[in-house]
Curated annotation (Swiss-Prot):
Name of the protein described by the UniProt record: Glucose-1-phosphate adenylyltransferase
SUPFAM superfamilies noted in UniProt: Nucleotide-diphospho-sugar transferases (SSF53448), Trimeric LpxA-like enzymes (SSF51161)
HAMAP family associated with the record: GlgC
Catalytic activity: alpha-D-glucose 1-phosphate + ATP + H(+) = ADP-alpha-D-glucose + diphosphate
Top-level taxon of the source organism: Bacteria
Residues annotated as binding alpha-D-glucose 1-phosphate: Y101, G166, E181, K182, S192
Species assigned in the record: Bacillus mycoides (strain KBAB4)
Summary of subunit composition and partner proteins: Homotetramer.
Role this protein plays: Involved in the biosynthesis of ADP-glucose, a building block required for the elongation reactions to produce glycogen. Catalyzes the reaction between ATP and alpha-D-glucose 1-phosphate (G1P) to produce pyrophosphate and ADP-Glc.
GO biological process entries: glycogen biosynthetic process
Upper lineage: Bacteria, Bacillati, Bacillota, Bacilli, Bacillales
Entry EC no(s): 2.7.7.27
Amino acid sequence: MAQKQKCVAMLLAGGKGSRLSALTKNLAKPAVPFGGKYRIIDFTLSNCANSGIETVGILTQYQPLELHNYIGIGNAWDLDRVNGGVTVLPPYAESSGVKWYTGTASAIYQNLNYLSQYEPEYVLILSGDHIYKMDYSKMLDYHIEKEADVSISVIEVPWDEASRFGIMNTNEEMEVVEFEEKPQFPRSNLASMGIYIFNWAILKEYLEMDARNPESSNDFGKDVLPLLLDEGKKLMAYPFEGYWKDVGTVKSLWEANMDLLRDETSLNLNDRNWRIYSVNPNEPPQYIAEKAKVEESLINEGCVIEGDVKHSVLFQGVTVEEGSMVIDSVVMPGAKIGKNVVIERAIVGSEMVIEDGTIIRPEKNVDDVVLIAEGK
C-alpha cells in the first residue's frame, strides 16, 4: 500500500511537438535540449522538487525511449523516493487491447488507479514542454484559500497572440466565468499555462464523466473545464508573473535560448535558491584555444572552441574549428562545425556535422531562424 500523499503531480510528456520539425523526429518534445545543458522537462521536474512535490507520474507516449532513459528513477531531481518519487506511465495494454492516450484528459483518466493508491487530496496537472520557474506550493495554498474545485495558472499574453491560447474570462475575484479555447476574438488576454490543481474527488468524477461521452475529444481545455463551468463548479485563475515560454516552434525555442544571454534575464539559471537540475553529461572541461574568441555565450562541458562564438548557446561536446564563426545560434550536443564555417541565427541539431566552408543564415527574411537537423 502506497503512503498517502497530500498532492500528487501528473506531468503530461507524451507530445509529438510536430512544429519543432526534425528536432522531434526521433525525440519527444519534453526531451529536446535547451539552455546549453538541460532538457525542456528539467524545468517542470525541478519545479516539483523545489516546491516539495515528491510524487510525480510522468505520462509518456510519442518516442519515449530517450526520455525514459533520461528520467531514470528521478535521482537527478532528488525524486528517487521509496514512497512516491518519479513513475513513468506509458500507455498499456488491457484485455481489450492497447489504449493510447487520445487527449490530455484521457491520459490522466487511464491512470486513475495510479492516483488512487496515494489517496491524494489534490492533483497537480502539468505540461512537460514549457520553460519557466514556479513554486507550485504557493499555487496550492491559493487553491486551498479560495476553496476552489479547480485552479488554473494564467499569464497575461500580448493581445495579438491571445487567439493562440486557452483564454480565461474572470470576475474581479479572479474566479473564471468563461473559458474559450483559442478564440478568434478574445475578450481577455489571460492565457492558460496548462497548469491545473484539482480537488481529487472532482477530478475523478469529471474524468469518468468525460470518458463516457462519445463526442468528447478527451481534452481538459476543450471538454473538461467547460463542463465544470457549465455545472457551476468553482474555477479560480491563479495569476503568474514570472518568465514563461511555450517553446513549441523552432523560432520560439531559439528565442528562449537567446533570452538566457540577456544581461537582465527574468529566467535566472544561477539562482541558488531555485536550481534547475539536469542529468550530468560527465564530459571533460571545455577547451578554448588561444586564437578563439567567445562573447556573451553559454558554453557547456566537453566543447572545443578554436573559432569565434558570439551570443550563442553551445551544448556539451560541440566542436567549432578554426576560422569558423557561430553568431546568435544554438548548437546542440555533439555537433561538429568544420573550418571556415559561418552560422548565424540558426539551430544546429545534435550530432550534426557541418562541412568546411558552409554558410548557414536566413536567406530571405533576416528575422527567420534556420534549422539544420537530421531528417530536415
